[in-house]
Amino acid sequence: MFTTSSIIDNLNQSEGLEYKKLCRLLKITKKSDKDKLDIALTALEKLEIINKNEDDEYTCIKNSDHLVAKIRCSSKGYCFAVRGKEEEDIYIKENLLNYAWNGDKVLVRIIKEGYRRRSPEGIVDCILERSNQILLSKVEIINNDVYAIPIDDRILSKIKLPKENKKYTFKADNKNIVKVEIDRFPIGQEEGLGHVIQELKLNNNEEYDTDFVLSKSNIVKSYNLNNLDSKKTEKRDRIDLTDKNSYLFKSWNSNNSPMLPMIQIEQEKNKSTKLWIHTNNLAERIDLTSKKSLEILFKGFESLPLLNDWQNYLSEAIRNDSEFKLDEKNEAISLCLHLDSDNEIINWSFHLTLVKCSLIVRSEHTEALLTRKSKSRITSRVLKPIKEYIEDLDKILEISCSFRQRHILEGKVEIPSPLNNIEALKEFFIHNPAEYSKGYFESLNKGDCQTYLSSILYEANLIWFKHSNQYGLKSAGYISKGIDYVNANEIIKYSEFIDNDIELNEDGNCTFSQVIKLCGDDNKKRILHKLLINEFNNNEIRLISKNIDNDESEKLFISPWTIPGFDFTNLINQYCIFNMIINGKKSKKNNINPINISESNSLDLVNWDIFNSSISKNLEILFNKFVIDKLNEFKYKVNQYKSNMINIKKVRKAEKLLGNIYSGFILSVQTYGFFVEISELNVEGLVHVSTLNNDWYEYRSRQNLLIGRKSKKSYKVGDAIEVKIIKVDILKYQIDLELT
């Protein structure tokens, strides 16, 4: 189904499109769909967003007054059109939303310019794309009609349901929420219409938790992955490395988890090393020039953890053909790093290879390797069966630690992963070496072998940015922002968690890493880590090209490609590498004096475009603003989902312990109360100011505390207190506490 956004995106990418060509691009063949397209085109013309020239071609009006934005609403009903980080938000009054909902992509027209500290005001003229096709709602009867009332109070509409949906009327005891599919969005004087597709009875019932949280995060799996075919790979020249030992480091337990790369090590006599990273050859298996494949991939850009399982973004057929299996030959796309005796990277090269997995390295292996007392005598029952591989594994772990040490010296920050004591959430807390949306590193952890894979893959991903950028190729990736933006005043608020004996360096400073280590108490340390994590912004995926803005030219870029089984970003970067290896031009003209463009030694020798126009056109379909925006939208939903899934399971845990009393620490203080972490349970809850009935408490922002007017009793971050669990709200993921 096409959207207004897809019409405008197609028109923006061309000088002019005839009606038939537009239909072809939008895959419209049915008369009913063409009728809808006609209505949309007429409306867009009247709004002066597009026009039709004398050649009967549709084009976007370049200097239109309309701005593309996303609607963001608060629970109190205030709505803004958000344009971007550098642009000012536009305030939209409720009566000027024209039924745009929170999260919708819209075209906004400014009707009143901003002045002083007031935001500009605007009106929504066109809804480009709806973010909600499924609504979680309560069913209520209003004037004998049946309506779905969204549980998300940022959505300011109700949906009319058929009479037969009356049986789903909300009962507080059952907490019976329904999933409503929208048949027609509200427009003009017409109400929105929908129908119930599923009832979720949430009260003391964990069966529907995953379904509930996925729907609340707007992640709807309405597509069939089996339609994503696995291509048969062509016979190509590959380096045969099947006689060498390759190691697959894996902590994830689910069979459905993302496929991981393998590491191979070759130690030379002069103490230099060849370090190979072998990645699953998905770029060869998936036809990224096929509209059918892209249509499926665009509906789910990333694999995500469920309870004790994963929702993979790739079909089972593709995974079966590409996954590295023990003692089986596999085709791979590989990077070879040449390291000196100090584990510094001297040069690198990309290759097509044939490999074989010798050992699946588990977390018990890394723990035994890193905690053993003697390196000459093997006594561990875990290590005895893998005795022949220990020398290689020791070297891989040494290289991983060297790389990480270098990253920290360059200014990166390491924070340990939060603790988890809920068995169902185990896969959520295992380190994901493909995750770069966080602004910090998770610490190397001998109990999680994937953390040691992470620092090696980080280098491999940095290298693809350097290589692709030198050739003027686009890539999808992240900017490493450093920590300059972190608010020092917020960190000062957490001083209650830090020991008093702080040592400053000769410049009178204390590094961020030192601050993290200054807390002695384990419970306080864990809470400090949690608070510090909140100070880091999430990184967004960026379209990286040769023409980097001046203010970004000194920043560190990373272009992930090593785990294409995790997400679309890795896949398209790997696809670019694959094309460089098999289709890249090796000389300026007719292969005279060809050079190996896959080697780092060739980077300064190439002064020509390495791809012809056909390959460049295929890559342009993948590397453009539209795709990057979609990737970020999906990534935002997935991050919301993961956070909410953890929260609902914590609430479920507290639900079984109502009335119990626990010790805790104050995490943060607000005008309406303070949040407390119960260390024993690893859950957080709110003590509302209204429950502090022994005095009138006021919030002092400078000191970040609540203080009683009469008693002068204060509550601040880091205070140890005792609380009772009095109430939980599954729908809002909230735990209410009171002081004892």
Model-derived segments and spans:
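Charge-lined substrate channels and their catalytic hotspots, especially those that engage the 3′ end
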Residues: 1-274, 279, 283-329, 360, ...
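Short beta-strand-to-coil "C-cap" segments at the C-terminal boundary of structured domains/repeats
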Residues: 200, 738-740
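Electropositive polyanion-binding surfaces
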Residues: 24, 164-165, 179, 185-186, ...
